[in-house]
Amino acid sequence: MPARTKARKRALDVLFEADLRAADPLEILADHTARADTPVPEYAVRLVEGVAAHRAEIDRIIEQFAVGWTLQRMPTVDRNILRLAIYELLWVTEVPDAVVLAEAVKLAQDLSTAESAPFVNGVLAAVRANQATVTASPPPGEPPD
């Protein structure tokens, strides 16, 4: 399994647990880092930190493009797959959009319901198609474009 694929899964594990426990993802990340048998990949840390920093904005984007669905109505795993992928689409420039979508759909296929993969694909395709109009603030420490 490629390194970034593993990192996405580890990041999803942290985000999922934080969501279920209504906890701060950064605290869950610190806990995972402290008790992990294998180190938490740097890319997983970057993803969790990015989602945590932009969560309100990401959730607004999900609600905008998940027509007919509220965040609370979505399965927890789907909601966090979308958070992870939208962060990558809007703030991680070195990963091609097609890879982000494919990885998110694969996570949904592997970890969620039969309906989840098409749902995740549809929401992310809509975000990607409207990327120019979706406002994404720059990562911390970087100037706006």
Curated annotation (Swiss-Prot):
The keyword tRNA processing does not apply. Gene3D superfamilies: NusB-like (1.10.940.10). The keyword RNA-binding applies. GO terms for biological process: DNA-templated transcription termination; transcription antitermination. One of its GO terms (molecular function) is RNA binding. Transmembrane segments: none annotated. Keywords: RNA-binding, Transcription, Transcription antitermination, Transcription regulation. HAMAP family: NusB. Involved in transcription antitermination. Required for transcription of ribosomal RNA (rRNA) genes. Binds specifically to the boxA antiterminator sequence of the ribosomal RNA (rrn) operons. Belongs to the NusB family. This is Transcription antitermination protein NusB.
